[in-house]
């Protein structure tokens, strides 16, 4: 069984410079292949064509896998969005492969919906289903009476994708530590980010979700141990004339929960979370690495 759709998204700047900022043509195919009564293979692929040549070109991680994403130029992209095998066995539901995992109840907000990194090539205008970057991993659901236990594990790492430098969607105010100090004002050199290793168990990400239906209300408790999707820009001084910004991804713990309550034709939703170990840029020039951490 398969479906496909064509879509065009075009935008024209009415102020200088008067030009098309994009004429983006999508072709996406979704194929579900039933292997047995208890196993199904899903493949989702997407091709983008933009004759204006405004597709982003340097925002992805080739090390994540050579079949994830291919580009011939800045007007053509082909991407394997999802490829996973789903197996249902008794009270267990297994999903192996490249996939999206969606947590949370909020509409238009990503409080707990942070399992997959996000594509910011058009800032936050894309629908989340298109903006999420699928990852290679495993999801397991176990149903026991009114309880559902979900576990996720990812050996694949990708960071958030930003728009190219010079794009109208570029983050203009990228937060970097102050490069001034009490004794020096040397311009800083930004080095390439240090990323977690794909396929390394010690660098993997994992999480759990416990869900229960209770008196017309669905409630959940969530936990996710992950890497920051944006690298933390640490400042490092190697001498009077050698000041560097060394971005590194750091570990974080997300703890939260959700609930939704249905009555008549109405549904009330709630969601909250706390991110432990989050890092923030410090404007204090006496701060050694330019970063403060929230415990």
Q: Which functions belong to the PLM regions below?
A:
Residues 2-8, 41-43, 94, 149-151, ...:
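Transmembrane beta-strands of outer-membrane beta-barrel proteins
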Residues 12, 19-27, 76-81, 88, ...:
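Residues that define the transmembrane beta-barrel architecture of outer-membrane proteins
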